[in-house]
Amino acid sequence: SNSYRYAGSNPNNYICFGSKESTCPEDNLYRIIGVFGEEKHGISGKNLVEIIKSTTLGNYQWNDRSSNDWASSVMESTLNVTYLTNTLSGYEDKIEKVLWKTSGLSRNGVTPQVIYNEEIVNATSTHSAKVGLMYPSDYGYAASPKYWTYKLYASTETEDYRAAAGENWLLYGVTNEWTISIDPTSTSVPWNIGYTGQLYNNASPIAKWITRPAFYLASTVTYESGTGTSTDPYRVG
């Protein structure tokens, strides 16, 4: 599909969103995951820029009960009610409502392409909303391209994404981080990224872990200034 992704240890993909201050406040600093066509977001005929909060919103539960249904989850409402209306107030019209792929990923120990094909290309359910989380495939493709043949989980760290930890800008690396994708072989497990770099399906959704909102900029949003560094992020209007 026609897409562009930022990959490697620290690309110049910073963007200031939701603030006009001359120095972008940390809470308004995001990073561009990439530019994607309909295959990923479901909006026909549009290439959209997807961004993710640079720092964590906090540690949040994926759900408050043993269910991994995204549409009814606590996380979905945390992002699309609390975060969207409070933090992004006045900027909602600059965010595109898209189709998030919610059928998930049924197996671990595979490469980013295998993950992308299952959770994105062959998705069997979607949820229409403005805000979501990153997909495991987003995390996989954020590593330097030489690692794209590695598995996101293996028993040996030289064979999985622990080896790519220093060359993947999406790895937060403090504690585990939630993704939007579920394990459909279970009724209760979402996927998370471990702080050492592996992909896991080992946790209850009630665990409170790093949460970084992700969303797509509306196609009407235009570039204004900036070079994409953390101190001179892209500015949009």
List each model region and its residues.
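Collagenous Gly-X-Y triple-helix signature in extracellular proteins
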Residues: 1-237
